[in-house]
């Protein structure tokens, strides 16, 4: 290999590594969005803490949740694509866990993925736990509410910049709380 070619290759490799090491410029915006999520709540709203666990029996969950929400959240089912009214929800506000009311996303975290399910590129910090799901043979990452353990959906690496993440959420696992307080 010629010396000039070797030097060019090394320089390009160094620059590529530096670019990978530096956080994207708009990640600061994500951090601010995550930090300031409470600004999307209606005035005077009380929200549960993720450190207050909700433990109910299967029968208690069955009584508390509508049938489809129970199937998704307690039996790790999936709602039919395109059926959730939350797909078209555009108002400012908070998306909370339908099982326990824990805020999990803001309206600013939502994006149109074209999949038929409400999709988000990031979350309110500390609200979900993840685990591998081998239901469809290949491994996927599913996420559950940290407070009540309810299944919400799956996490994919095909979302928009800067996170590249898509939290594909079942609409029946969420309830929307508009910032203006009007249902």
Language model segments and positions:
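C-terminal segment of N-terminal export signals and the immediately downstream linker at the start
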Residues: 17-64
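N-terminal secretory signal peptides and thylakoid transit peptides that target proteins
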Residues: 1-14
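A short Gly-Trp-Pro
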Residues: 48, 53-56, 62-64, 69-96, ...
């Amino acid at each position: 290999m010629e010396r000039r070619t070797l030097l060019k290759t090394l320089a390009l490799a160094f620059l590529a590594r530096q670019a990978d090491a530096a956080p994207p410029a708009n990640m600061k915006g994500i951090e601010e969005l995550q930090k300031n999520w409470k600004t999307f709540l209606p005035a005077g709203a009380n929200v549960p803490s993720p450190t207050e666990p909700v433990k109910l029996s299967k029968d208690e969950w069955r009584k508390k949740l509508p049938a489809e929400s129970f199937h998704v959240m307690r039996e790790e089912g999936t709602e039919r694509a395109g059926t959730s009214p939350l797909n078209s929800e555009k108002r400012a506000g908070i998306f909370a866990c339908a099982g326990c009311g824990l805020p999990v996303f803001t309206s600013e975290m939502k994006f149109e993925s074209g999949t038929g399910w409400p999709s988000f590129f990031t979350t309110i910090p500390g609200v979900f736990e993840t685990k591998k799901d081998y239901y469809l043979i290949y491994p996927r990452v599913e996420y559950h509410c940290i407070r009540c353990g309810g299944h919400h959906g799956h996490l994919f690496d095909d979302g928009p910049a800067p996170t590249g993440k898509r939290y594909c959420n079942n609409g029946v696992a969420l309830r929307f709380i508009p910032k203006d307080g009007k249902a």
